[in-house]
Amino acid sequence: MTDHSSIAAHWNRRYDEQNTPWDSGRRSQELQNVLAETGIAPCRALELGCGTGTNAIFLAQQGFEVSAIDCSELALATAKSKASEAGVAVEWLSDSVLNWQPPGEPYEFVFDRGCYHCARRDELRAYLTTLERITAAGSRYLALTGNANEQREHGPPGLHESQIREELGELFNVEQIREFHFEDPGGVRGPLGWSCLLVRR
């Protein structure tokens, strides 16, 4: 059984130490690309592992009705401040994605920039259960994950395409999987990743 309090403490410590290389402070270019290419219209949306809220705020600015969840209270405090400055409304949820009991209807669009590739190491089955709870037939799920095709000393956990298809294929049909690069702070090109757009069966 996963110790959810220790997971939250780990991520709070990372934010307290400002050891957050994934937090570029820039809205995800790949998220923008996918929205533009697919024509996903504003709808009820959720970001899993939202961190300091950059992408959740961007979605709200595009007209989405956004909820965003993270286990780090420190990250959420920053996210709330940024949303207030941006003048947008986001429902910020403090909980672990591995044991969250969503209170309302399923979401039509779910965005995940790096949550899946971390959560699967702790408790894949619990993560898939959460995905099942928060989506319904036709819901779209965009997961940006690390890519095992690139060997790096530092960077996100790497996955092979076959792992993604096997694990997420229990619930979703694959609309597209392609390689892309994360953005590091300062606009520097970051690690190689997978951009995975899936549709709930």
Task: Show which residues each predicted segment covers.
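Class I (Rossmann-like) S-adenosyl-L-methionine-dependent methyltransferase catalytic domain
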Residues: T2-L46, T52-P102, A119-I134, S139-R201
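Conserved acidic functional residues
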Residues: N55, D112-R113
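A short acidic, Gly/Pro-enriched loop at the edge of an enzyme's catalytic core
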Residues: P102-V110
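Short catalytic micro-motifs in class I SAM-dependent methyltransferases
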Residues: G114-C118
